[in-house]
Structure formats: structure tokens, C-alpha cells
Amino acid sequence: GVFTFEDESTSTVAPAKLYK
């Protein structure tokens, strides 16, 4: 994805840092 949480299955268009 564009940004990811754990992996590509949870990718998002928002910056990953906001979800860490």
C-alpha cells in the first residue's frame, strides 16, 4: 500500500505514524 500498519493487508492513504 501507500502506507502500512502491520503489512500491505492494512495499507492506507494516511501516514502510518498516526496509527502506531
Swiss-Prot record:
Induction: By heavy metal ions.
Family: Belongs to the BetVI family.
Keyword line: Pathogenesis-related protein, Plant defense
UniProt name for this protein: Protein PR-L6
GO BP terms: defense response
Highest taxon in the source lineage: Eukaryota
